[in-house]
Amino acid sequence: MNKDEKLQITKDKLIDSTFRLMEEKDDPMSVTSREIAAMAGVKPGMINYCFGSRENLIYQTFQKQYLDFLKEKETEEIIRSDVPPKEILKKLHFIVAGCLVENPKFTKAVSGFVLFKRDLGRESFSYPYVYRHYEGKKTEAECRLIAYELSTMMQLIIYRSEDFRKDFGIDLTNPEELKHYIDMRIDLLLA
């Protein structure tokens, strides 16, 4: 086994251990580097070596779960469908928001990282559809920015879902209200 394969095995162990520990806790961000390393059977320094920080490991753990979720059959059917990109975005964001609403403790755990520390150069799942929607009428940078705004706004609304219910009367746990809100947001940003 070569060095890269061993490193990938270590990364996978760290991600799996992080996910299991986060599921056990009321506050997923309270998971410590030492707990993660102990469960993974590696030294705590491997977290920084592999991921740069505990926060990035937590984010990567969330990303793995999120990407697995996006590979589900329903999502693949939407992506392959022959509907306009804006409609694909509405459907995908509704599915993703549903996942985020169902897992509020994970959403809250990664929101700070997503909003303040995530590499903005990384492509979001929304970008290709935003770009196709504008068909060259906006630059690549403008389309990336719109995709980023869609992503960050989704994180914020889910993070503050109780405030949305209290202050605006929008119950994001109600699928119809969630869909209406997402459609409205996408219509505003992709006018």
Q: Model-found features: residue ranges?
A:
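Helix-turn-helix
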Residues: 13, 21-56, 60
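Generic hydrophobic, amphipathic alpha-helix propensity
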Residues: 6, 10-19, 36, 61-65, ...
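C-terminal peripheral helix-coil segments that are non-catalytic and often amphipathic
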Residues: 128-140, 159-191
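Short, flexible, glycine-rich and Lys/Arg-enriched loop motifs at helix boundaries
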Residues: 23-29, 69, 73-75, 161-177
